[in-house]
Amino acid sequence: VYSMVQEMCANSIEHANSDKRKKNWLFAVYYDVDKVIFTMTDIGEGILSTLKKKAVQLFQDAISFKDEVLTLDGIFDKKYQSSTLDTNRNKGLPKIKEINSEQYVENLKVITNRVFLDFSNPKNSKKLDHKLKGTFYYWELTKKSIERWQTRNI
C-alpha cells in the first residue's frame, strides 16, 4: 500500500497542478468489517490532460479511433512516455497496476477526466458523460491480499 500511495502522491504533486504552488489532494481510509478501503483524490488536471504524446502516437491513435479508456489503460501499461520526458520515468502508474495485478490490493478503480477504469473488471471501464477535474483512486486491502503479499517471491 505504501508504494502505491507514494506513487499517487508523487504524481499528484508533480503533475496535477504544474502551474500552481498549492497542491491539493485528499487521502482517506475507511475500516470495514473484513477490509480496509482507501481513496486518494487530487484536484489537478487529470492523467489524460497531462499526457504528452509523441506525434507518431497522436497519429496512430487518431487513425485507429482509439478512445480515452484505451489510452488511459495504455498509460498504466507504460505505452506512453512520461510528461517529464525523462528516460528513467514512467514507472509509477505501471507499478500501481502491477500491485493490483499481483492482487496485493483488490478492486482498484480510477476516475480521471472522462474515464472510469476498473482494473478488477475491465468490462466495467467506460467513458463518462461528465469530466472529473483531477484523479480519483479507490482500492481495498483484505486479509487475502495481505497474505498474498506476505507469501510473495522476493
Name these PLM-found stretches.
Residues 30-39, 54-59:
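Short beta-strand-loop-beta element adjacent to the nucleotide/active-site pocket used for signaling
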